[in-house]
Amino acid sequence: IGFASEAVGRVIPTHSTGSLMLDLVCGSGDRAGFPEGRILEIYGPESAGKTTVCLLAIAARQQEEDQKELADPTYNKKLCIYLDAEHALDLRIAEEYGVNLNELILIDPVTSEDALDVVDELIRSGQIAIMVVDSVPALIPSSVEKASYNQQFMAVLARFMSNVMQKIIGPAHTNGTTIIFINQIREKPGAWSPTG
């Protein structure tokens, strides 16, 4: 606890998004790109390029980690996680965007709770640079799987996401893990689509 004036000089490290234009939109100079240790949400309509932005950010961060390791052979480089809740990631496309699949942890969850327990442990290890969650509507808690989709799906998902945020926001900040949630814009708030 302290006065905000004491923290004025504090700089939040940023990392390239993999796109110069997006870096500049997110900041300027040495503050361009996605902030380290923060939670971000990329949202938009289906096929708007949300996954592409995330794959480019992963590729850029992997290259940055490679450069750090080249400069200092004792450096323990961080990895990236792609939590594919939609079960739709095309790994060939990821590779075309420059993602090193040998250094990408892919989580293809059966239930969201199981996946997020693993993710929480990995983030707390301090060895994760970026985690992408694709996508928020596909994070189906087991309580929803067992129930009818008519039983207030959106309310259950909102409570689940609130619990997720409470669990990961502190460790992500402490360990410098950038977490990117992909979300979609819907015309009908109850509708769900496994793409986007």
What is each stretch, according to the model?
Residues 84-86, 135-136, 181-186:
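A short beta-strand-to-loop transition that corresponds to the Sensor-1 phosphate-sensing loop
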Residues 102-112, 144-160, 192-196:
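Flexible beta-alpha connector loops of hexameric P-loop NTPases
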Residues 122, 154-196:
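Phosphate-binding/switch region of NTP-binding enzymes
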Residues 127-145:
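Conserved P-loop NTPase "ATPase switch" module shared by AAA+ and STAND
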